[in-house]
Structures are given as structure tokens and as C-alpha cells.
């Protein structure tokens, strides 16, 4: 079966098949090697890419900008303070304007419906840099990183996600593992599992790929024998302090600490995090939480001991955001 990623959107990974995902991963590997060896060739000369950020970002913005610059493209950063989006101009109208000026558009924001609307009206490829429901560029980086740190083929790699599995990370880790035939475990309170219809959709993908999907409320069952443990923050900047109590009490059993990571029985288990992480109280939010919950001063979703240990590969994971995003840009806009 042939395929062509030229001018394709990247909105959730639902519409990308396993062969296309593997191609993007292989291309990211090749582009990373070329950058490291100084042999990279620009394929995006005279291309212009708009970066819409309704949510702030460090890694996603830097990854898109560096990936584009490395390949010879120009970018324009657009945030709510510097545009009329949502104030005087709808996303539909914004899409129709930007689509006439740019070769592609990246969007990082809130509802998946917004990025879908942008893609419907822009007439150029649209890339989802993060929505409440999905984080596809992060998934490519995560699988690339797991590949680099395992001598197993993808279908033999086992990984777990612990925490609030209703969010974009929980959804997306379940989805990409189901597509690629991997062994995926979700460890979370049942009330924080992905939506039932989404689980059913992933189970259908798993039936085709041979993936093994496990959802459990027992964190130790989730991580038994895994090669990688993923997590994400439990609370976000801007959430009312009153909302923290219920969330933290529900998720405390899923904290990634030395006891839990050693319970895998696998001395090669690695820890992954999409970042930022509250692994200490050196940030504004971390400090606020530590003041309210003194027992979490050394880490919330992950302890500082684990985060600063050799098991943690979160920063390689962060670097791979740039290489995988570059693969998306080149395959979509570079005509290869």
C-alpha cells in the first residue's frame, strides 16, 4: 500500500496508519543523524509557517521554530495578545486569511474542535501542537525516544501511563500504542480513564495491529515488567487551589517514586515525562503545592529522586520533539 504525506494535516494520529507513523519515525531518526553529523540539507526553502499559540509553550514553540529554521523555512509566532483571534475575528476567518499567506499552520490551544475547524477552512496543512484531547507531536517524540532506549522491536515494547488518563497524554499514548501494536498500560482511578467510546476505538485499532491494551486502577499492576513509565502533571497553572485537594488525593497512589519504579522488576525501566514537571518546589506552582501539602515538597507526580536519576530520559524526549516535528514538516511540505 502506497501513501503520500504531502499536504497532510496532523490533527490527532487517528487518520495516520501504522506505516505512515513508522515512516515519520524513521525520517525523524535520519534527520537527527544528519543534524548531528552536519550533513542536513534544507528542504523547506521559501516556505512560511504560522504558529498559533493560544496556550503558552516552551518545548513546542522552540521545537517548531528550530525545526523550521534548520530546514530553511520562516515562521511567524501568533499569540492572543498579538492577534485578533477570538476577539474580533473567528477561527474560521483566521484560517481563511492565514491559508492565503502561509504554506502551513501550527495550532496549540484548547478544544480539538478548534484545530479541526482551522484545518477545514485553511486550505493548507494544519499541525496540532496540543489540544485538550490530543498531543500528536509529543507522541512521535515519545515513541522515537522509546525506540532509542530499547533494543526491542516496537511490538515488544511495554509502557505504562500513570495519572489523569482523560487528558491529551493519556488519550494519545493509548492511541499511538494501539496503532503501532505496542503493549500499553493505563494506571488511573476509573473516574479518570479515557472516554469509553475512545477506548473502544483504540481497541479496534489494537485488534488490527496486535497491540495489548490494559486499563487498571492498580498502579503496580500497570507497571509490572514495563520498559517505560510515563506521567504528566496533576494540576495546571490557573486551576483554583480548591480543585487540587480532590485531584491530588485521587492520584497520590500513582506517584512515580522509587518504590513504584523498582516494583517493575525491570532494572532497565526508564522514566518519561512530557514536561514541565513538578518534581520539586522550585517553581511557583510547585511551591504553592508544597506549602499546602508539605509531604509533596520533594515531588508531586514524580519524586525528585526518580526525576534526577539515570532512569529519567525526559530531556532526550524533549529534544526529540524537534526532530519529529521536523520530520512532519519535511514530509508534509518538502515533497519527499
Swiss-Prot record:
GO terms for biological process: arginine biosynthetic process via ornithine; arginine catabolic process to ornithine; citrulline biosynthetic process; L-arginine biosynthetic process. Gene3D superfamilies: Aspartate/ornithine carbamoyltransferase. It comes from the Bacteria. It catalyses: carbamoyl phosphate + L-ornithine = L-citrulline + phosphate + H(+). Pfam families: OTCace, OTCace_N. Keywords: Arginine metabolism, Cytoplasm, Transferase. Its EC number is 2.1.3.3. Its main location: cytoplasm. L-ornithine binds at residues 168, 232, 236-237. It is found in: Cytoplasm. Pathway: Amino-acid degradation; L-arginine degradation via ADI pathway; carbamoyl phosphate from L-arginine: step 2/2. InterPro entries: Asp/Orn_carbamoyltranf_P-bd, Asp/Orn_carbamoylTrfase, Asp/Orn_carbamoylTrfase_sf, Asp_carbamoyltransf_Asp/Orn-bd, Orn/put_carbamltrans, OTCase_ArgI. Carbamoyl phosphate binds at residues 57-60, 84, 108, 135-138, 274-275, 321. It is an enzyme of class 2 (transferase). GO terms for molecular function: amino acid binding; ornithine carbamoyltransferase activity. GO terms for cellular component: cytoplasm. Belongs to the aspartate/ornithine carbamoyltransferase superfamily. OTCase family. This is Ornithine carbamoyltransferase, catabolic. It comes from Burkholderia pseudomallei (strain K96243). The gene is arcB.
